[in-house]
Amino acid sequence: MRKVAIYGKGGIGKSTTTQNTVAALAEMGRKVLVVGCDPKADSTRLLLGGLAQKTVLDTLREEGEDVELDLVRKTGFGNTLCVESGGPEPGVGCAGRGIITAVNLMEQLGGYESDSPLDYVFYDVLGDVVCGGFAMPIREGKAEEVYIVCSGEMMAMYAANNICKGIRKFADAGSVKLGGLICNSRMVDNEKEMIAEFAKRLGTQMIHFVPRDNDVQRAEINKKTVIEWNPQAKQADEYRALAKAIDNNQMFVVPKPISVDELESLLVEFGVIS
């Protein structure tokens, strides 16, 4: 079973990218479990046809310790298994801690097992690696390969570089490696070439460039992934290509983060900042 974590700046499109990629993997016959590690609990919505799934933490609060697996693990598009860790009540407690609680409960309940063996578990993780709880999937060895969703915007690249620092920190202690950058296009000038160069400097690859397409939003309005909403769409093929690239990936590295000065000079070089 491959254990994958998807990281990236808040609002970059991690959850949308993850769900569309997972839908494409399911279409390829892969058995996938998605664990949403975000208090917003929107990591599985499109796979479940818009269903706002009950989170592990909400269920624990309501049911106490006596929780059945069926309450927190739902089946979505293409027989994907979907779990949302959820978060604490606003203003109380630590969301990172919630991820730890949710993953531990899933292990106790046998949530990582199914009728047919799992090929993948995907952790869709909130934002930047700013606190230990959100770093938990890579720190505790729950995830072994990381993909970072970024774009040609400065803050997205800055966040990606920071996440590489986190991976580097935990790579010594465990088996976590970076599998590549996924460029979720924001139509920035020279974006594709710049992210390919950025990946090279980090010692990794741009595993796929996902062009911007309004079909993604149209599918979301219909509470579906593009793969399910319009399998013939050009954008569906982009997600299939990304899924195949991940499925066939052999390049796993401990990244070499670059300095802020080097990052800024890269942005200047490609004309993003003057």
Curated annotation (Swiss-Prot):
Keywords: 4Fe-4S, ADP-ribosylation, ATP-binding, Iron, Iron-sulfur, Metal-binding, Nitrogen fixation, Nucleotide-binding, Oxidoreductase. Binds 1 [4Fe-4S] cluster per dimer. [4Fe-4S] cluster binds at residues 94, 131. It comes from the Bacteria. The modification ADP-ribosylarginine is found at residue 97. Pfam families: Fer4_NifH (PF00142). Its EC number is 1.18.6.1. One of its GO terms (molecular function) is 4 iron, 4 sulfur cluster binding. Belongs to the NifH/BchL/ChlL family. Homodimer. This is Nitrogenase iron protein. It comes from Dehalococcoides mccartyi (strain ATCC BAA-2266 / KCTC 15142 / 195).
